[in-house]
Every structure is written in C-alpha cells, then in structure tokens.
Amino acid sequence: MPRRKPTTTPAPAGSRLFPVYRALEVGGGSKAALVQALDRNGCYVGRCAREMIARASFTPAGSSRTIKLARVQLSTLGVTDWVTWSDVLKAAAKVGAEKVPAEAAARLALELPDQQPGDHFWILMDPITGQDGEPYVFYLAAHDDGERRLLGRYVSSIRRFFPHREIVFGLPA
C-alpha cells in the first residue's frame, strides 16, 4: 500500500487569532539556575534535555521579558496528515505562529506544577543540534504516574507528527 504524501491545507479564515495559553517570563538567569529550579520543583529533566541545555546554542536571555504563548493541535495550523518538523514549521509560519526561545520550554515546565497526567506537548523552536548531529526540540509531558518531565526529542526528517499532536508557540507582540 503506497504511503500518502504529507499534506497541509490553508488554515481556516480567522485562525490567526489564537487564545493566550500563558504569559511567560523568559530571561534573567543562568542555565545552572534553571536546571536547579526544575530539580527543586520536582520536574524530571531527561538526559537529552540536560544535554540540550548544556549546548552553546541554548542561551537564556540576559534580561527578562514576557512572551505570550498559544497552545493548539497541529490540525489548527492546517496540518491534515502526518508531517515532518519542517512541515510543522511551515504550517506555523503561515498562520503567524512564532518560534520561542529554547529556554521557554524549561520556564514553562516551572509554570506547570499542576500539569495533569497524560498531558504532553511540543515546543515550537529552532532545533538544538545534539552530540549525535541530530536536531532536537523540547517536549513537555506529565507521565501517567504524575511525574512532570522536560524531555528532548529528535526531529529529524524521519520523525512524523500527526494532526492531533499539540504544540506551544509564541504569539506576535
């Protein structure tokens, strides 16, 4: 049976107005302080996520600022079938969604102490290249046992995303 080609369709009219999921403060701290805060607040930081934070391309902003975030299913961005990360980025750009700084994932994990078991979502960001040369982005999840997790997941061209997956992205200022 032949595989269907990944597709996206134009977003429905008016979909550029997304509700604010969270207003999040980013910047004003070190990588070490961020990881310590996650550990202290009971958020498991996966090995890959720790490696991503340690990379030179993960740079917390020097001064604080607030960004507005939206959270939607990929289908809201016009995704109708399984797609690659580059397709997700294109669909997001078409509706005005903005990539967030990598540190937003860790800061968001700190803001969700009551994240419900089974809740999980991707972060729309520029990938961080791992030690293996593969691109990775952050993924936040609350395991079925209630453990909150900040994870790194590869987004190479072989990974596919289905329309029901959720993503958090920035809203224009």
Predicted feature descriptions by range:
Residues 1-173:
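A binding-site-centric feature that preferentially detects glycan-recognition modules on secreted/surface proteins
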